[in-house]
């Protein structure tokens, strides 16, 4: 699995526009090739956002990243958010598969 992490702060002057934009942005980025999408906010309720996308492999991530509509969404994000960062993580050679506790 490949994990793509994005973090940002909602621009303080654009909170309403950001909330409206997210309704379409999530649908436009959660497309075939994405195994899972999740979004997080700090428990403190601040304007920070973290999202994760999981892909089967680097090729799936690269295909997703190369799509014109994905690039459009990312460009739009930069007009509504500040401090945007991204991280791309590949599988660990030490723990290549998930470890799930028994129930």
Where are these regions (language model features)?
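Short, flexible segments with low predicted structural confidence
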Residues: 1-2, 16, 32-34
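Short, well-ordered beta-strand segments in beta-rich or mixed alpha/beta enzyme
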Residues: 2-9, 38-67, 103
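Intrinsically disordered, low-complexity segments enriched in polar/charged residues with Gly/Pro
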Residues: 14-15, 25-27, 39-41
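Residue-level signal for secondary-structure boundary sites
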Residues: 14-16, 59-61, 94
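An amphipathic, aromatic/His-enriched active-site/gating alpha helix that lines ligand/cofactor pockets
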Residues: 20, 24-36, 54-88
């Amino acid at each position: 699995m490949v994990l793509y992490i994005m973090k940002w702060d909602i621009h303080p002057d654009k909170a309403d526009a950001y909330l409206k934009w997210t309704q379409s942005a999530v649908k436009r980025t959660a497309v075939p090739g994405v195994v899972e999408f999740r979004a997080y906010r700090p428990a403190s309720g601040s304007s920070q956002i973290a999202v994760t996308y999981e892909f089967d492999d680097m090729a799936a991530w690269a295909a997703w990243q190369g799509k014109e509509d994905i690039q459009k969404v990312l460009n739009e994000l930069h007009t509504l958010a500040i401090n945007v960062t991204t991280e791309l993580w590949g599988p660990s050679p030490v723990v290549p598969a998930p470890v799930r506790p028994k129930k």
